[in-house]
Amino acid sequence: MDRRKFLRNGSLTGIGLTAIGSWPRAYGAPGSNSTKKTTALNLEEITIQALQSKMQSGEESSVSITKAYLERIKEIDKAGPMLNSIIELNPESISIAEGLDLERRNGKVRGPLHGIPILVKDNINTGDQMLTTAGSLALVGNRAKEDAFVMKRLRDAGVVLLGKTNLSEWANFRSSHSCSGWSSRGGQTKSPYILDRNPSGSSAGSGSAGAANLSAICVGTETDGSVVSPASVNALVGIKPTVGLWSRTGIIPISATQDTAGPMTRSVQDAAILLGAGTGVDESDPVTNESIGKSTKDYTVYLKKDGLKGKRIGIEKSHLTGNPDLVSLLRAAMTVMETQGATIVEVDVLTPLKLLGTPNIRFCYMNLKTG
């Protein structure tokens, strides 16, 4: 599926399914008998806040949580259904977790991400033993000298980097007809909900891994839909930050005007936590200066349980026809939003907006060629 076409035709359905919690179960999700329990820690749908509570109480440690995720990756990403969402594991993840546990025992907790495992897309530089290849065999052997700026911010916040996720090669700019979730280095990533269906891209690995609970949180990158499309397909919360809120330094580029990394998580609250942790002014990326005085380190303060009250939400009428199961789920989601105070407005096909897709992608191609 072309992710731009998906954005036009599929994202509202994804929002609806997520809103009512009725998305089909991912491989190993609650109620599934597909995976064998190997740990007392239930990672399915667990939040940052819940993990922090377990570490604070001493029930778990960053090391035990990290090991639990690594075992889950072994069971369903590298075996079983072989989701193939992770292109490389970090050999230093346990030692990182040990250091963060030591800090906690000494009374230092950096913040809500202290000791929390994370996966990042393989076009984001990490100054460690892992490669940064954008999924391409052409870059095999490429080790970054230092972290991307946003990776530095996240490490400073206390994350445990589990590894790197697969992607549509070169962030889906390998060709004008590339395949979502496939790279020459990593192979084809699968959707954890329906193994033979498209996981969308280009942040396919982050979407699949997040949906399968292979990490507490994930990071993707987006030029034109590469965070929000796989997030929607995989029932995640994806945010494309305003360009400049997160630095682009150290991320393999496509467009100087549209590229950015962004959060991909299981919940809105976790996305807000991750969004704040990644912000910061970077001297090497002048556009981040635009965020001075406009950004914050804690976006959770803007979360409101009654946030839909008084809001008008438009839904194209075309989404209310077709597959009866999907239509039923979407209408149920519409009802939930209405009970939360939103007004649902059914609108005709927004043809003028859809016409923007072609010139936009041409502009991205121009950006890519001009560097």
Where are these regions (language model features)?
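Gly/Ser-rich catalytic/binding loops embedded in alpha/beta enzyme cores
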Residues: 16-19, 33-224, 242, 335, ...
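Acyltransferase
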Residues: 66-67, 98, 298, 322-350, ...
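A short helix-breaking turn/cap at a secondary-structure junction
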Residues: 28-29, 34, 240-333, 351-354
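C-terminal segment of classical bacterial N-terminal signal peptides
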Residues: 20-25
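Structural signature of FAD isoalloxazine-binding scaffolds in flavoprotein oxidoreductases
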Residues: 228-233
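Short helix-loop capping/hinge segments that flank enzyme active sites or metal/cofactor-binding pockets
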Residues: 114-134, 297-316, 365-371
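Charged, often glycine-rich, active-site loop that binds/positions anionic groups
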Residues: 133, 176, 180-183, 356-371
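N-terminal secretory signal peptides and thylakoid transit peptides that target proteins
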Residues: 1-14
